[in-house]
C-alpha cells in the first residue's frame, strides 16, 4: 500500500481515545445542502427527541426554506453558504449533504471550527481529498462519520431474514 493509502486506512482504525458529545441537552444540528439525500437525514433527525435542527444552508436561494417547510421543520435559520451557517450558529454537528464533488470544503471547514460532521457518502472523490479530510478530523479532535448505514434498505432486511432463518 502507498503511504497515502496507509494514512487513509489508518482513519478507519479505532482510536484509543473515545470522543464524547454532551448528551445532557438537545443536540443542535445544521444541514448543509438540501437536495434529495438530505431527506433521509431530516426524516431520521425528526425521529430523535434529543436532536434539534437549527439551521440549513443551500446555494440555491429559497431551496433550504422550501425543503424545511416540506418536512414540517420550523424555527430553522437559513444561510446561503456553509461558511455563514457555521460562523453564525452554535452547532453540535452538521450533516454534509452536498454534491459528491463538494464534500471536502464544508467538511474541513466544520471540523476546523469545532463542529462534528456526519458526511454523506462518498467520503470524497479523490484520495488527496480524503487525506485532507482525515488530517482535518485528526487535528480537530471532533467526530467525523460517514452516512452509510443500509440497515433499513429492503435488500438488507431480506438478507437479514435469510441469515436469521438459518
Residue ranges and their predicted role:
Residues 48, 88-89, 153:
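Acidic-histidine catalytic/liganding microenvironments
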Residues 124-166:
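A contiguous active-site-proximal alpha/beta segment in oxidoreductase catalytic domains
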Residues 2-73:
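N-terminal Rossmann-like dinucleotide-binding module
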Residues 66-75, 132, 136-140:
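Short, conserved SAM-binding/catalytic segment
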Residues 28, 52-55, 90-93, 116, ...:
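Structural signature of beta-strand start/N-cap positions in the alpha/beta core
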Residues 76-136:
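Beta-loop-alpha module in the N-terminal Rossmann-like domain of NAD(P)-dependent dehydrogenases
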Amino acid at each position: 500500500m502507498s503511504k497515502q493509502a496507509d494514512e487513509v486506512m489508518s482513519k478507519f482504525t479505532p482510536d484509543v481515545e473515545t470522543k464524547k458529545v454532551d448528551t445532557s441537552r438537545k443536540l443542535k444540528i445544521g444541514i448543509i445542502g438540501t437536495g434529495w439525500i438530505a431527506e433521509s437525514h431530516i426524516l431520521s433527525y425528526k425521529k430523535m427527541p434529543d436532536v434539534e435542527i437549527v439551521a440549513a444552508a443551500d446555494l440555491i436561494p429559497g431551496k433550504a426554506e422550501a425543503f424545511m417547510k416540506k418536512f414540517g421543520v420550523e424555527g430553522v435559520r437559513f444561510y446561503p453558504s456553509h461558511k455563514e451557517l457555521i460562523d453564525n450558529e452554535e452547532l453540535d454537528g452538521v450533516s454534509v449533504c452536498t454534491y459528491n464533488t463538494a464534500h471536502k470544503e464544508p467538511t474541513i471547514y466544520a471540523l476546523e471550527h469545532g463542529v462534528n460532521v456526519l458526511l454523506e457518502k462518498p467520503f470524497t472523490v479523490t484520495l488527496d481529498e480524503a487525506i485532507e479530510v482525515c488530517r482535518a478530523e485528526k487535528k480537530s479532535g471532533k467526530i467525523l462519520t460517514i452516512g452509510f448505514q443500509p440497515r433499513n434498505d429492503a435488500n438488507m432486511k431480506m438478507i437479514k431474514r435469510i441469515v436469521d432463518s438459518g
